[in-house]
Amino acid sequence: MSINDDVICNDSNNPHFQDVLKDAMKDPSRRNILRGGLGLASMFALPMLPGCGGATVTNPVTQLPAGSILGFSAVTKSILDQVAVPSGYTVKVLHATGDRLVSSIPAYSNTGAETDDWSQRFGDHHDGMDIFYVDSNGRYSATATSKAVLAMNHESSADSHLLHPRGQTSGGVNGKKFTQFGDWDVKARPGLEVLKEINLHGISVAEVSLDSTGKPTGYVVDSPLNRRITPQTLADVRGPAAHLAAIRASFVTRFDTTGATSRGTLNNCGHGKTPWGTYFGCEENWAVYFNMPANSTLPDAKIIASRKRYGVSNAVLSSTATVGSGQGWYTPTDMEDTDARFSRWNVAATGATAAQDFRNEPHTFGYNLEVDPLNPNARPVKRTAMGRFAHEAAVCGIPVVGKPLAFYMGCDSRNEYIYKFVTTAVWDPADFGGGIAAGDKYLNEGKLYVAKFNSDGTGQWIELNISNTLISGYTSSTYTGFSFTKQADVLVFTRLAADAVGATKMDRPEWGAVNPANGEVYFALTNNSN
């Protein structure tokens, strides 16, 4: 995403990391650290201990070894439109956008001639991915075997004009191109085009073929392990037992009036891999796909206020509007609206209650979706205890037997925060390969934290809990009508809770990683104006 597409939704007075750094640089010793090449990591490394709670952690500076630590020669600079790899390495396409998972549909034409709905093809904008090896008993293996599947995110439909014979169509006119970011021309779209664009998103799981040395050579069409998880795939809504009923109340729509399930996943960017062998598809820029047509009725003030904080449609389109966000997925009239597959993207209050419309549909996105890549029959799960925001990655600290697990997560938007989820359950290697059941054990119950950095090089993990009076007493002139009344609000409206406790704004926290040698946690911050 370009900086111009990334709308800033955080107008809190919380300090920005740039300001924290500026204050830190007033100390000559810290300026010398930067001049010495150790960079910000030595000054502001994330506290690693999963149980540190609100404790202050100081990060000692360690000297990096002299010389290059890369085990290969870097590629030379190039302006060619091709993938470049270091000497001694090769690159090969395993699968590409539009390739089929099953032989019952035609091979991809690359001309837009496909008449299927794309739910059995690889999506577009390949992003986070991980490989999962399979042992002789069909269970997850942490070491290489002769069989593997590749789980992969498909983030965006910004280039979906290429799926259709003559570009995107609206108002009966073709040859158009709409990103998700405010350039749809507010005219009706054809159903098949919209279905392709919807199903272009999500996650693919595909068995990869391996040569005699274990190197992937391609993928296996018709493998029983192949599947797609799209925005239309049924998912369970799970979370802490004491708050689950209230969380599910925020998921109530005409599709599921109990809120126990939701549909699919959207705009998956970064990913995560659990110690027990499941996959996280992290839902990032999901907020831009919804709209409210002209002359619609607005939902209540609390919903509208929360939408402002998340960048979701919070005002109806004017009758004279010529552009809107999303790609007009709620507009088709030439196909049946089966299971409200189109109307769900209209998030106005069209019914008397939330159970009669889709005003709550945005609440069903913004989570880590857990998928068992080795069990095609296992329903994906929205892990609500890990919070709702623009999830970019969910990286797990080094598991220690008998200790809680810690997952580190970034909210990938300008001025947003870094989070941590610490499990209540302690790690037991017997859960290795335990699938979604293991996920229930570790991910339903735990504590959610947000990071605050100080100019002296220390930092705190602040727990996000309704018992904190900064949260329970939160008010804002910008988000009039919003207040926290229960812990479920904290988990569904996590950004606002982080605002309340004074978390440090960051420059778009994107991918994270854990150093396997010492457990250090790193995040790439990718967007500022400098």
PLM feature spans:
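Beta-propeller fold recognition
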Residues: 190-201, 214-227, 416-497, 501-504
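Structural signature of eukaryotic scaffold interfaces centered on beta-propeller domains
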Residues: 127-143, 265-273, 395-401, 510-515
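Beta-rich catalytic cores
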Residues: 125, 267, 364, 390, ...
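Beta-propeller blade signature
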Residues: 201-208, 364-373, 421-422
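N-terminal secretory signal peptides
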Residues: 1-29, 42, 46-47
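N-terminal twin-arginine translocation
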Residues: 26-32, 43-63
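Blade-edge beta-strand/turn elements of extracellular beta-propeller
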Residues: 82-93, 106-117, 213-259, 371-388, ...
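Carboxylate/His-rich catalytic cores and anion/metal-binding grooves
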Residues: 178-236, 272-347
